[in-house]
């Protein structure tokens, strides 16, 4: 049973790394405002941007959120709705108020 849990964790980690890699590669496509590692200049180290809701409001979230099951659930919803090859940044398909409530509980 412990082996299955560990394998599942590794699969989740690989999926999350793939999502972040796709998002960070957007700087190459979009041009300015990015450093040499293709990361947005206004995003502190250890964080990444996500876009939430119909208006695609931008939020900067810590990488530590990736370990929380609630946030992982949002990422899975994003994958189901947009896939990994989405040129509009990491978009979370949920209401902004729901996102704000969830992230305030995680912090």
Curated annotation (Swiss-Prot):
One GO term of the biological process aspect: auxin-activated signaling pathway
Coiled-coil positions: none
Main location: membrane
Alphabetical UniProt keywords: Auxin signaling pathway, Cell membrane, Developmental protein, Growth regulation, Membrane
Claim: Cell membrane is one of the keywords in the record: yes
UniProt membrane topology term: Peripheral membrane protein
Tissue-specific expression: Expressed in cotyledons, leaves, flowers and siliques.
GO terms under cellular component: plasma membrane
Subcellular location as annotated: Cell membrane
Presence of the UniProt keyword Membrane in the record: yes
Induction: Up-regulated by brassinosteroids and gibberellins. Up-regulated by auxin. Up-regulated by phototropism and gravitropism in the region of the hypocotyl farthest form the incident stimulation. Transcriptionally regulated by ARF7. Down-regulated by abscisic acid and methyl jasmonate. Induced by zeatin.
Assembly and binders: Interacts with BZR1.
UniProt similarity note: Belongs to the ARG7 family.
Role, per record: Provide a mechanistic link between auxin and plasma membrane H(+)-ATPases (PM H(+)-ATPases, e.g. AHA1 and AHA2), and triggers PM H(+)-ATPases activity by promoting phosphorylation of their C-terminal autoinhibitory domain as a result of PP2C-D subfamily of type 2C phosphatases inhibition, thus leading to the acidification of the apoplast and the facilitation of solutes and water uptake to drive cell expansion. Triggers plant growth probably by promoting cell elongation. Regulates branch angles and bending. Effector of hormonal and environmental signals in plant growth.
Name recorded for this polypeptide: Auxin-responsive protein SAUR50
Species lineage: Eukaryota, Viridiplantae, Streptophyta, Embryophyta, Tracheophyta
Gene that specifies this protein: SAUR50
């Amino acid at each position: 049973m412990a082996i299955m849990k560990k394998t599942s964790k590794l699969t989740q980690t690989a999926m999350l790394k793939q999502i972040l890699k796709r998002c960070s590669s957007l700087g190459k496509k979009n041009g300015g405002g990015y450093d040499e590692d293709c990361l947005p200049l206004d995003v502190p180290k250890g964080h990444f941007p996500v876009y939430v809701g119909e208006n695609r409001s931008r939020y900067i979230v810590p990488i530590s959120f990736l370990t929380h099951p609630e946030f992982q659930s949002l990422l899975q919803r994003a994958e189901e709705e947009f896939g990994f090859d989405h040129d509009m940044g990491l978009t979370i398909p949920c209401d902004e108020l729901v996102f704000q409530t969830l992230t305030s509980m995680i912090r």
